[in-house]
Curated annotation (Swiss-Prot):
Protein location: Fimbrium; Membrane
Swiss-Prot/TrEMBL keywords: Disulfide bond, Fimbrium, Membrane, Methylation, Transmembrane, Transmembrane helix
SUPFAM superfamilies: Pili subunits
Biological processes per GO annotation: cell adhesion; protein secretion by the type II secretion system
Organism: Dichelobacter nodosus (Bacteroides nodosus)
NCBIfam families xref list: IV_pilin_GFxxxE (TIGR02532)
Consequence when changing residue 156 to Q: In strain: Serogroup H1 isolate VCS1215
Name of the protein in question: Type IV major fimbrial protein FimA
Keyword Transmembrane helix part of the UniProt annotation: yes
Additional notes on this entry: The sequence shown is that of isolate 265.
Transmembrane segments: 8-28
Domain of life: Bacteria
Length: 156
């Protein structure tokens, strides 16, 4: 009686495991970069929406606590230490937060500064993304995150 062999040999299984290991070694860092880039873009979008509220406050002449920004904090900013008061100071690095600095005059420089907290990717902890309004009423974005994570609209 002839016996039939079924299944894979040890060599075949080892080759499959090696291929999976190589693919994982390439894919995991790429995925981590993708996550960090998407988080920077998300914070840029979330904080960028506050520009309209700040413009409205400036046009209405409202100051500090009289100006309702109407923003729900982002879990990527981990709002510890952040504030939305007139001339707020920077949050504790690594803790994250949101600081909005604006003056009553529309000719002054106004800022929306977001600091990435502990819920963001490890490479983003303590990094900042800032929207700055010039006296000419134009907004620009700047950030200190690594170049490979910067969104197209925030390359400064």
């Amino acid at each position: 009686m002839k016996s039939l062999q079924k299944g894979f040999t040890l060599i075949e299984l080892m080759i499959v495991v090696a291929i999976i290991g190589i693919l994982a070694a390439i894919a995991i860092p790429q995925y981590q970069n993708y996550i960090a880039r998407s988080q920077v873009s998300r914070v840029m979008s979330e904080t960028g929406q506050m520009r309209t509220a700040i413009e409205t406050c400036l046009l209405d002449g409202k100051e500090g606590k009289d100006c309702f920004i109407g923003w729900t904090t982002s879990n990527l900013l981990a709002a510890a230490g952040g504030s939305t008061t007139n001339n707020a100071t920077a949050a504790d690095p690594g803790q994250g937060g949101l600081n909005i600095t604006y003056a009553l005059e529309s000719t002054a420089e106004n800022k929306i500064e977001a600091t990435f907290g502990q819920n963001a990717a490890a490479t983003l902890h303590g990094k900042k993304l800032t929207w700055t309004r010039s006296p000419e009423a134009t907004w620009s974005c700047s950030t200190d995150v690594d170049e490979k994570f910067k969104p197209t609209g925030c390359k400064k």
